[in-house]
Amino acid sequence: NDQMLYEAESLEECIAGEIYKPSWDPQGSTFKWFSEQDGDETVLYANFHTQDPNREKVEINVRRRCFFPEKTGCGYITVHGFKIEKAATTWAPPAAFQDGMIGPHWSKGWIIEDCEITNSKCCGISLGKYYDPENDHYFTKKHLKSPTQMERDAVCRGQYHGWLKENIGSHIIRRCNIHNCEQTGIVGRMGAVYSVIENNHIHHINNMQELGGAEISGIKLHAAIDVVIRRNHIHDCTMGVWCDWEAQGTRITQNLLHHNERPAYCTWAVGG
């Protein structure tokens, strides 16, 4: 019924269906799911409490993205008036490939307008980084370099991958309703340069609190070079707008932001 269930760490936790204390929606957090492998099969369990899954709308999301080019460099595409929802997107850190339910994938001149974007496991819109096999999660995979050093490397290596005004950025995101995504409404590392983000309603981001850390916000950008963020209404998010490294020439103006903080009744999430 358009409500994401909370992932349990064990079948016992799923069956118990107890409140997840960091959640901004305590009662909603009692609806759980759990999965385990049985040979070649994946077995799913869910706690619907008194609701009958045979009568309600139950969806299992496995698609990683909704509208996102497989290759980089597919520029000048307009997406207008769509409802884009429910994708099993993955965590989008700045030192690795960043995906979202929709995004230009390292290209130029996209317009995403008048769309509703909702229920992404991680990010709604990604204006972010391409996949670089020579600089992707090395801290986790090879225990080499800190994530901070990987970010420094990404700035230099971006030149090898066409990070020039002629090729990348200059996107427009406008009049979209972006909500109930669990990492960011809009994320972008380097790929958002020279873009305009305006007149959007961004709300209820990261309210489940299953994810935490330094990449959570209504809008979270690295290298927001000459980006204009204006006339957006952003509320009920874990932080409103966060422009991280390389916020050169960034203009944030005429936005309305409120209630972008953890409610008093919530505990801190792990990593939050």
Q: Model-derived features: where do they sit?
A:
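Extracellular polysaccharide-degrading/modifying enzymes targeting complex plant/algal/animal polysaccharides
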Residues: 1-106, 111-126, 130-164
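Short glycine/acidic-rich loop motifs that flank beta-strands on beta-rich extracellular proteins
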Residues: 64-66, 88-94, 99, 121-127, ...
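Residue-level marker of regulatory loop/turn positions in helix-turn-helix DNA-binding domains and
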Residues: 71, 94, 104, 165-166, ...
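Small-residue (G/S/T/A) turn/hinge positions that recur once per unit in extracellular repeat modules
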Residues: 74, 107, 168-169, 192, ...
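All-beta strand scaffolds that present successive hydrophobic residues in beta-strands
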Residues: 77-79, 110-113, 135-136, 172-174, ...
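Surface-exposed acidic, glycine/proline-enriched linker/cap segments
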Residues: 138-169, 173, 211-220, 225-229
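Active-site neighborhood of glycoside hydrolase catalytic domains
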Residues: 199, 204, 208, 220-272
